[in-house]
């Protein structure tokens, strides 16, 4: 309907029941007034002023609105609602223009707010289908700047400033609110298209009809000024729901990325990328606007944040997402033996999968073991809705969870599972890790803990943060704590040369800032350090032990032998002597990590480097004098039956808290995935 150079301009002005002017639309208040005037660009003639009052759903006007507009709520009772008012507008414009073949018009407003922040958001909430003419418009402020580059900046420009620049007389205050603005805009437009300016209105602003999904490469350069973070989203919301919340603003292709937590579930946050900084700034004005009954917080974010969530480099994912305008559904809880044919049969003919087998993407670990997740493409919304109705239906003996998904979620899940092990395990031969004389006393408080570090902090940043106390750090005494993904957790432990220096460092450096973040510093001992790494808490109020340090009761059928209990040497090397019941005195010349051993942290997300040890294994050659430790094969087999289908390794290990199990062959899969086997030695250990 809109040509590049329209024949007519329709000047449009809206009024809401709340804030107006520069804050128009920022408070989610409804439209109560529409004013418009038609301008013939060819004849340079201005039509009559038209006005329609609109009845909002909530007939409450703010005091500011009453004072500025002089509109009373009683006068709105008989007014039409927004949908009928828009129909009157469309019909009136069509009759006045007598639109025929080749006749075109375009809306013109004072700034972006009337279209992007008022009409589109409210119409979206009320499920009103806006006419096509509302998807393109001219921003008179921008057009004025193109014609008169020497005028004020766009943000400072308004109708009165433009009128003053052109030398217009100020309108009488007898004009009702909005009428003087519409009259002035008509005069400004006629002046711009006349001598000496002879300006032509072309290339109007566009409003996206719908959100387009797509992929984003990790190598892509993204402007930080186009990204926002939305918080408080309903867990079942999709990228389409986010696009609807920001209706009227143009989101970049594939620019809505839902964030997942450590368990792969949505955490109520999303990162959104807009086409420009202007649209990002308008999005920030929707802070605490509502999605259903929930208010959504909107904050600035960075391009790096967006790439961490939405970026990907997998060719397999790119090929899977190459089909545009597809609806993505995520399957969770699949049997590990599930095939593409079984998935196709699960959905059936009512919701055919796009491309058959090519429309199914199974998620696997780096060694190609299935995770139980898959993504499926559907050609239209109808097929996707039919598919979602199969939520929690059975495939084989397992019920399948179905969720609407996004391209960014596909990237996140694939990135999470396809990453190689981030904490590499040591390989043969057995190597000495730490000479015994350098193991620090566990009760001496010669360590400090740094909490709240920036995730990008390096050892050099920590040394600079400690200042004069950096000279008191022991060799290899800085230990960065990582989370399960191998990324910095914001914590660090540092071994000082003496308890006095550790005390002074904690006193003087506590809550100093590092890269705009304040960092907490606590004095602690090596034993307290281990407590924290196993899930305890350490602050200035003292130390709270982790769950594994709470008193453990012996099994009722077990009695301790009279002699001292002995556990395997390789297992004993992993624990402090004070943690073992009746430990036998062990005097190894060095501490070892046996070949193939796996270290499990049952109660915490940390993967620490042991006190005094290097930050990675394998840098130190094996001593020729060190002999291999013989394997300890005694043990008992326990069969677990009736496990929940979603039970994982962590739940099984927590169930056996207090027992020492053999980590290298601890879990053995069986045919029934709700069962597992655990082997552990006969010794009873409180860990």
From Swiss-Prot:
* Cellular compartment(s): Nucleus
Q: Which Gene3D superfamilies match?
A: 3.30.70.330, Ribonuclease H-like superfamily/Ribonuclease H (3.30.420.10)
The record's section on InterPro entries has:
ESRP, ESRP1_RRM1, Nucleotide-bd_a/b_plait_sf, RBD_domain_sf, RNaseH-like_sf, RNaseH_sf, RRM_dom
Q: Name one GO cellular component term.
A: nucleus
Q: Which GO terms describe its biological process?
A: mRNA processing; regulation of RNA splicing; RNA splicing
Tell me which residues make up the RRM domain: 226-303, 327-407, 446-526
Keyword list, A-Z: mRNA processing, mRNA splicing, Nucleus, Repeat, RNA-binding
> For this protein, what is any one GO molecular function term?
mRNA binding
Q: Does the keyword Nucleus apply?
A: yes
Task: Tell me where it mainly resides.
Answer: nucleus
Q: Tell me, what does this protein do in biology?
A: mRNA splicing factor that regulates the formation of epithelial cell-specific isoforms. Specifically regulates the expression of FGFR2-IIIb, an epithelial cell-specific isoform of fgfr2. Acts by directly binding specific sequences in mRNAs. Binds the GU-rich sequence motifs in the ISE/ISS-3, a cis-element regulatory region present in the mRNA of fgfr2.
Q: Which family does it belong to?
A: Belongs to the ESRP family.
Under what name is this protein listed? Epithelial splicing regulatory protein 1
Species source reads Xenopus tropicalis
């Amino acid at each position: 309907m809109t040509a590049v150079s329209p024949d007519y301009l329709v000047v449009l002005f809206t009024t809401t029941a709340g804030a107006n002017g520069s804050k128009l639309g920022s408070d989610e208040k409804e439209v109560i007034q529409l004013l418009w005037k038609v301008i013939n660009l060819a004849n340079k003639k201005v039509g009559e002023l038209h006005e329609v009052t609109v009845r909002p759903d909530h007939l409450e006007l703010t005091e500011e609105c009453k004072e500025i507009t002089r509109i009373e709520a009683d006068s709105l009772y008989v007014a039409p609602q927004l949908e009928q008012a828009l129909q009157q507008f469309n019909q009136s414009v069509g009759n006045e223009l007598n639109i025929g073949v080749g006749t075109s018009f375009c809306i013109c407003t004072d700034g972006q707010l009337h279209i992007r922040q008022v009409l589109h958001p409210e119409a979206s909430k009320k499920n009103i289908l806006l006419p096509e003419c509302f998807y393109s418009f001219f921003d008179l402020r921008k057009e004025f700047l193109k014609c008169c580059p020497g005028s004020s900046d766009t943000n400072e420009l308004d109708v009165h400033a433009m009128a003053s620049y052109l030398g217009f007389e100020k309108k009488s205050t007898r004009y009702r609110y909005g009428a003087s603005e519409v009259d002035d805009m008509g005069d400004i437009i006629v002046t711009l298209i006349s001598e000496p300016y002879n300006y032509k209105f072309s290339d109007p602003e566009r409003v996206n009809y719908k959100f387009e999904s797509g992929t984003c490469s990790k190598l892509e350069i993204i402007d930080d000024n186009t990204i926002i973070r939305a918080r408080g989203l309903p867990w079942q919301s999709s990228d389409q729901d986010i696009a609807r919340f920001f209706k009227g603003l143009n989101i970049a292709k594939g620019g809505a990325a839902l964030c997942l937590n450590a368990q792969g579930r949505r955490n109520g946050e999303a990162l959104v990328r807009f086409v420009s900084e202007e649209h990002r700034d308008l999005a920030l004005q929707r802070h605490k606007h509502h999605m259903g009954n929930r208010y959504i917080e909107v904050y600035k974010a960075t391009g790096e944040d967006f790439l961490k969530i939405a970026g990907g480099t997998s060719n397999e994912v790119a090929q899977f997402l190459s089909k545009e305008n597809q609806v993505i559904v995520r399957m969770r809880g699949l049997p590990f033996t599930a095939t593409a044919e079984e998935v196709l049969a699960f959905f059936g003919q009512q919701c055919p999968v796009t491309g058959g087998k090519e429309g199914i993407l199974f998620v696997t670990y780096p060694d190609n073991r299935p995770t139980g997740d898959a993504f499926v493409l559907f050609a239209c919304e109808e097929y996707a809705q039919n598919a979602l109705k199969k939520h929690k239906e059975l495939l084989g003996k397992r019920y399948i969870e179905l969720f609407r998904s996004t391209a960014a979620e596909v990237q996140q899940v694939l990135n999470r599972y396809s990453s190689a092990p981030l904490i590499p395990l040591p390989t043969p031969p057995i190597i000495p890790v730490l000479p015994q004389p350098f193991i620090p006393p566990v009760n001496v408080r010669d360590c400090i803990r740094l909490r709240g570090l920036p995730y990008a902090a390096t050892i050099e940043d920590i040394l600079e943060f400690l200042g004069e106390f950096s000279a008191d750090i022991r060799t290899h005494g800085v230990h960065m704590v990582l989370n399960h993904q191998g990324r910095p957790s914001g914590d660090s432990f540092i071994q000082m040369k003496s308890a006095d220096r550790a005390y002074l460092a904690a006193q003087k450096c506590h809550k100093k800032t590092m890269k705009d973040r304040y960092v907490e510093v606590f004095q602690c001992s090596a034993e307290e350090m281990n407590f924290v790494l196993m899930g305890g808490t350490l602050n200035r109020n003292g130390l709270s032990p982790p769950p594994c340090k709470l008193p453990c009761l012996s099994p009722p059928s077990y009695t301790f032998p009279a002699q001292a209990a002995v556990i395997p040497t390789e297992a004993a090397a992993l624990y402090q002597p004070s943690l073992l019941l009746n430990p036998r005195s062990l005097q190894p010349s060095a501490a070892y990590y046996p070949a193939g051993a796996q270290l499990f942290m049952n109660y915490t997300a940390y993967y620490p480097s042991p006190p005094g040890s290097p930050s990675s294994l394998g840098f130190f050659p094996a001593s020729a004098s060190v002999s291999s430790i013989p394997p300890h094969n005694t043990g008992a087999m326990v069969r677990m039956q009736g496990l929940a289908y979603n039970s994982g390794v962590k739940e099984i290990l927590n169930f056996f808290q207090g027992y020492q199990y053999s980590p290298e062959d601890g879990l053995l899969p069986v045919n029934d995935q709700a069962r597992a086997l655990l082997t552990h030695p006969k010794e009873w250990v409180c860990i």
